[in-house]
Amino acid sequence: MTFLYTARGSYDKTYEETGMSWVHYIEWSKLTHLTELVSLDGMLNEILVEPDYENPDDWNYIQTIGQYQTDFFTTPEFVFKRMIYKDKFNLLTVVVEPNIDCKDIKIDNYEFVGYELLDQDFNISALTNCGGFDETFQPTDLTDKGLIYDFEKAYDVKKRLLENNPEEHHADTNVIAVWRHITIGR
């Protein structure tokens, strides 16, 4: 497994920046049980890492899969070097398409928070930013952070999303395991 890194803005009831307010998001998404959103969706949890695309060395740290930039990076040092600093943020370690259950994998100073399902462009979360796929999963299938905690369930939802919505671009997803740093950004 390849561990990758990113930093994302926090999104919870204290969110006061431009964009959709937390209250409006909860009403729209119907995810009333969320306490915060720890997502890889760049529209909801903004990407805080800004690589210098003109610098050839930066491309050594930018993770691409196929033709897509993932907004994941190969080292935490690069994330800190190119990060837009905020008082509160999510420093994340991720694994794209893990082949084993990750909840018992221990990473120093990180806690496993669940599995995200991002579309093939690595932009939009099928779990929290598509208005719901009620034929495939229910809001109660998600944790209070908007992720799926169970490995088998994540891959089952991935499979059924595409079966039930073959024409929907955001239903063709990548399963991504997510760990969050327990002190940095908290």
Q: What is each of the regions a protein language model found here?
A:
Residues 1-29, 37-40, 49, 55-62, ...:
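Short aromatic-glycine-(Arg/Gly/Cys) micro-motifs in beta-strand/loop hairpins
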